[in-house]
Amino acid sequence: MKEKILIAIAWPYANAELHVGNLTGSHLPGDITARYHRLKGNDVLMVSGTDSHGTPVTLAADKEGKPVEEVYMRYHNGFIELFKNFGITYDLFTTTHTENHFKVSQSIFLALLRNGYMFRQFSKQWYSPAAKRFLPDRYVEGTCYICGFEGARSDQCDNCGNVLEPEKLLNPRAKTGDGELELRETEHFYLDLSKLEPDVKKFLQDRSDHMRDTVLGESLAKIESEGLKPRSITRDLDWGIPVPVEEAGWETKKLYVWFEAVIGYLSAAIEWSQVSAEKDAWRDWWANPKARQFYFIGKDNIFFHCSQWPAQLMGAGSAFMDIFAPSPQPSPEGEGVKLTLPFDIPANQFMNLEGKKISGSRNWAVWGRDALTRYDPDALRYYLTVNMPEAKDSDWDWAEFVARNNNELVATWGNLA
């Protein structure tokens, strides 16, 4: 019997080109899995897209002095060209800046609000009097108050991986040079993850027979030691998805990119259905408890996909369907259709370059587009597959790349074929 298989792959930010670490981390393993299930005769839907919102994208546009729309579309078109040339077989690669994604994301927000999993609260955020605006997330950098890392963002430290409280950041400075900063109060919506913690733990425990320990074990351990805490899901920004609240003051706020970008896995399936023969086909993967969903991401996104994303889906419950796609005959209380939860999250570790961490800012990377101008995609796919960082970080080594292609792909597999 055919299975419904959703291949959901991490959405790259529209602020940099993709390198071999991005490809072997999520796009290539997702493509390999999709090809395998297609060969088995299963119904596969493979989706992803360009993450077009959030401070990484607006900062890139600010740096170039160009409109955000122009910048994100340039990167988006570049991603599509790269995937085509590299043989990544997406059914749909879209963006988060579509009318459909806006509607789906706002419906999830309203469903969580209806079900009592959100609350409003004032908090202190960094404000630039010179620029006359709040500077959220990546617009402010400083020293992490947990591990002492000097390049921490106001919302998260990439060194220790902790979510940060902006007002506790040490030595804060505006990345855009917007003068001195001060703390001011602003109101935001918070997703009350603490209410959903028991459900998230059960979700993970129910998948203990097939999820990697680097994913399952680490996520459960973090929940046990730290718990799930409320997290703000709106921001003071002028670019992104409007908060669906018709009150004065909220027209200047947007949904937080980490809240709405993951909803793209759902909205992309809906968009694919809208351009296919059956507009409700997305339900086969998203309103079907027998469907299996596989999420291919990097290790830096593990905890988020194992905690907040399933929490959003479970918290929205059947209210999402009532809001987004109401049935002419509403289901009895407690019998509404709920969204399908992830089956597996096979996250990969990182690929380094000759022993050093890949860094786009230092131009220490093997860029996908450049590699394809010199080498055949099959040679690149082979090396990235056999050297995939599934259990631990791996390393791109030029000498090994040549040797494994000559000695294995050509001499061994080529002669066998």
Residue locations for each model-derived region?
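N-terminal, positively charged nucleic-acid-binding surface of large information/translation enzymes
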Residues: 1-203
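Glycine-biased, low-complexity coil/linker segments
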Residues: 331-335
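Long, compositionally biased low-complexity repeat segments characteristic
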Residues: 325-329
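Structured secondary-structure scaffolds
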Residues: 2-48, 100-104, 160, 170-324, ...
